[in-house]
């Protein structure tokens, strides 16, 4: 058995030279060396492949991130001074995750938490909750915005669905033909990209969808799935792109993400990513409610207000929940009893987390895993004010 204690989560950082940035490394205090010269698109704060550090302070120079890519992020690794989360769970799933979690999801980590900085991504959706399909699995997800951003959310009211499908289908056919020409050497990459840009203007897939502009502190809940969404980019108005904290059910993209428009992206060799346009239109929720962006912006619920801290529930779905705690005043405390695991992310400030007989220091941008067997944990504020996100 392992000690009853909190664990620093070793973040897995995904380098994304085309759509990442330096926000994540700066927040974590790691904007130096390799991380100062590479753009980071995502930090996996919790996943089934997470490793838990035995180090007791995120400010310890030996506490380092894992640098990886989106294809390898779930593969087993063995950083120094750590234990794999999966190994901890295997010792006693109920004691680590909680009885209700194991009953609902089985003896595995069901939650995927990502700290993201991203420019535009594809038009996409996930099959509706409860769908049984030989390939596709639902992927409930929710976004909590740290900075103002730009998205598409739902399809416009009164849209001609056949025209929308025809538009993205023909556009994809032309782009695939250009891809073959580049791959065969009969057309240059530059010429193909120039033609793609003209085709996007002609077919204009964005004319069919709603734009929305989340502010810092907004939460968008897409957990019912079947909802069109994408991140968009305007580097003049939103130079940081979309900076957000994502909660998802731990399902990988290759069995969950159905795309209809990939923004005309073409790799250096001329290849393009396959789209799933027929499935996109087969599984999209066409109801007015699902396609109204206002449906998905969630209002928080006030829980507690005390002199030393305040607590609000940002959201609660049948898969996961997210609370925000603001601790005010140096050495102010927060205490909680638990019947399931908790994940604590420090959005700002610095805290000391104690569970069992172990205390760890957690600075801004870092996170802690607290197993259910701790039964309770306490937080002492090490700064003037700290903002904490608690997921479970």
Which positions does each model-derived feature cover?
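Short beta-strand segments in beta-sandwich/barrel cores
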Residues: 151, 332-333, 342, 349-354
């Amino acid at each position: 058995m392992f000690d009853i204690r909190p664990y620093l989560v070793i973040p897995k950082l995904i380098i994304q030279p085309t759509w990442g940035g330096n926000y994540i490394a700066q927040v974590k205090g790691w904007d130096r060396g390799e991380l100062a010269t590479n753009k980071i698109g995502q930090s996996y704060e919790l996943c089934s492949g997470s490793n838990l550090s035995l180090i007791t302070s995120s400010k310890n120079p030996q506490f380092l991130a894992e640098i990886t890519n989106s294809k390898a992020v779930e593969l087993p690794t063995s950083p120094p001074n750590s234990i794999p989360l999966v190994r901890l769970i295997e010792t006693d799933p109920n004691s680590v995750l909680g009885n209700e979690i194991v009953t609902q999801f089985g003896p595995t980590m069901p939650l995927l938490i990502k700290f993201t900085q991203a420019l535009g991504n594809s038009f996409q959706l996930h099959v509706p909750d409860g769908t049984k399909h030989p390939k596709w699995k639902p992927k409930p997800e929710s976004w909590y915005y740290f900075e103002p951003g730009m998205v598409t959310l739902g399809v416009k009211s009164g849209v001609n669905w056949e025209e929308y499908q025809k538009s993205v289908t023909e556009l994809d056919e032309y782009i695939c033909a250009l891809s073959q020409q580049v791959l065969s050497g009969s057309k240059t990459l530059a010429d193909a990209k120039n033609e793609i840009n003209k085709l996007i203007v002609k077919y204009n897939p964005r004319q069919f969808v709603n734009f929305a502009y989340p502010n810092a502190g907004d939460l968008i809940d897409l957990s019912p799935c079947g909802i069109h969404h994408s991140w968009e980019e305007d580097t003049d108005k939103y130079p940081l792109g979309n900076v957000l904290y994502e909660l998802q059910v731990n399902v990988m993209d290759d069995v969950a993400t159905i795309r209809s428009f990939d923004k005309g992206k073409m790799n250096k060799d001329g290849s393009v990513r396959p789209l799933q346009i027929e499935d996109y239109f087969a599984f999209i929720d066409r109801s007015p409610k699902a396609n109204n962006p206002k449906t998905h912006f969630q209002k928080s619920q006030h829980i507690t207000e005390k002199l030393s801290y305040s607590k609000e529930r940002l959201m609660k779905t049948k898969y996961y929940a997210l609370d925000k705690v603001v601790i005010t005043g140096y050495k102010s405390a927060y205490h909680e009893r638990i019947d399931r695991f908790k994940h604590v992310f420090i959005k700002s400030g610095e805290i000391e987390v104690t569970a069992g007989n172990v205390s760890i220091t957690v600075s801004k941008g870092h996170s802690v895993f607290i197993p259910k067997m701790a039964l309770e944990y306490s937080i002492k504020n090490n700064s003037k004010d700290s903002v904490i996100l608690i997921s479970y």
